[in-house]
Amino acid sequence: MFVAQLEAGMGTKYENNGRSLGDNYCFACGLDNPYGLKLDFRIEGDCFMTETTLAREYQSYTGVAHGGIVSTLLDEAMGGYLVALGEKAVTGRLSVRYRHPTPIGETLKIEGKIESRRSRFVTMKATVALADGTVTAEGKADMVVVE
């Protein structure tokens, strides 16, 4: 069903350097989702990036972001980048390496990059880092371009 929605043009679209369009309800980037992260990505060079500060609603242990939320940050940095470049893509495989606890209430820098491409298959990587450059999580994904 989701692939059919993408092919019909109902998937997330990016414009204005990363601002989400469409129904604006994407959990990661949609501005109209009251529970969403409202990430505002931009393209800088070969990176898709944003900064955010996670609220307490997204914590696991006291003061630490839930791993699923951190995984969402990484996935959006990778998949969203391809969509921002005008390609409709889905995540085929996602792996995450948690290096350090990701804190709640501190500025985080999220970056996604294309590592390699073979036809419709794109390998991507992403990081979540603190303001001082400490990487708290790394992601790698195999994305599939569906159109």
Give the positions of each predicted feature.
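Non-catalytic linker/capping segments at the edges of enzyme domains
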Residues: 1-57
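HotDog/MaoC-like acyl-thioester-processing domains
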Residues: 2-19, 102-104, 114-147
